[in-house]
Amino acid sequence: MTGKAKPKKHTAKELQAKADAALTNRGGGKAGLADRTGKEKGGHAKYECPHCKITVPDLKTMQIHHESKHPKLTYEEPRNLHEALAAPAESSKPKPGIRGSLKK
């Protein structure tokens, strides 16, 4: 009589790939850029903690973060990053489109 076939468990390569995908910061690419930084969807990077530079979407979350991470410091309302970044200063020198120097 033959035995019942055992299903194969995950291979070491699969487990390593899964751990690598979970633990490596891959960036978001262009797909999530508007959601991470843009105004049109609200964006997730609206406010920045002045002490640890973490970004949060709203003032209530900032207050919760401040109470838990910086309890000994006084809470002051942070500035909105979108308003601060809305009008970047114009530089007099144009930037190259490709890495390297400007063509003369």
From Swiss-Prot:
Its main location: nucleus. It comes from the Eukaryota. One of its GO terms (biological process) is leaf senescence. Residues 36-46, 73-82 have a biased composition (Basic and acidic residues). One of its GO terms (cellular component) is cytoplasmic stress granule. Residues 1-11 have a biased composition (Basic residues). Induction: Accumulates during senescence. Residues 1-46, 64-104 are annotated as: Disordered. Keywords: Cytoplasm, Nucleus, Stress response. PANTHER family: GEO09665P1-RELATED (PTHR21213), PROTEIN METHYLENE BLUE SENSITIVITY 2 (PTHR21213:SF22). This is Protein METHYLENE BLUE SENSITIVITY 2. The lineage of its organism: Eukaryota, Viridiplantae, Streptophyta, Embryophyta, Tracheophyta.
